[in-house]
C-alpha cells in the first residue's frame, strides 16, 4: 500500500514539474504565501499532494531508505526489483522537492544500517561512500549547472547559506526568551503561522524545525519528553533487530523501518514536517510495527511450524 502511495506521490510531483501547478495549487501557493518558499528565483520546489515541499521531500527520503533496504533482504527477485525501482523514483522526487534537510534522511538511515548489520565490510563501504558523498557536495562543483544539485549542495556549506545563519540567530533569541518558560509558550503558539492566535516572540519567528517548534510550544520539558519517548522506542526496535529477531526477511524489513524512522528524525531538525499529515500517522504506525517485531517473529515461526 505504501509503495502505491509513494509512486502516486512521485507521479504527481513529476506532473507538477512538467505540466505546472493546477488552479487549486496555484491559489494555495498565493493565499498561504507558500510561493515565497516554493517559487524561488533559481528553483521551483514541488510538493506533490503533500502540505509542502519539506513534508514531501522528507517522506520521499523515508521511502528511499525503506524500499532500498527492503529490496536487499527480499527473497523474491520480482519484489526486489519493484522495491529498488520505488527507491530510485523516491530519491528523484526528493531532489525535485528542493528540500535540503531531507537529504540527511537517507544519509542517517544508511549510517544506522551499518551498525544494525554488524558487518565490518558494510561499515567500511559506508564510510567510503559517505566520504565520497560529502566531498562531492561540500568540496566540488560537479553538476553545479543542475539547480537541484546546486540547492542541495548548500546544505553542506551552511556558512555560505544566509537562511542557515538567520536560523541560528533566531534560535539564540528563542533560547533567551524561553529560558524561564520550561513548559513553553503553549500549544499552537509556535511559528509565524500562529500569529492569528496571538502576537508574541514565538509567533514572530519562523521555527524552521520540528524540534524548535516543539521547544517553542512545550518548552525544554516537552522537547526532552518527546525525544525520550521516540528515541527509547527506536532503541528498543534496534535491540530486537540485532538480538531477538530470527526470521531474516522480517529482520530486513524491520531494519529498513528503523533506518527510515531514524532518517526522518534527523531530517526533522531542518523541517517542521514531523507532526503533519501523513507523516505523523506513518511514523507512529511503523514504530508500532518495529517495537512489536518480536511478537511478529514468533507468529511467523509458528506459521512455518504448522506448515511442516
Model features per residue range: what roles?
Residues 8-10, 89-93, 131-139, 261-269:
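Aromatic-anchored segments of alpha-helical transmembrane domains
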Residues 29-30, 34, 40, 142-145, ...:
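Long extracytoplasmic/lumenal interhelical loops at the membrane interface
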Residues 25, 75-81, 121, 247-251, ...:
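Transmembrane signal-anchor hairpin modules in multi-pass inner-membrane enzymes, especially those
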Residues 11, 16-21, 97, 114-158, ...:
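A membrane-periplasm/extracellular boundary helix in multi-pass inner-membrane enzymes
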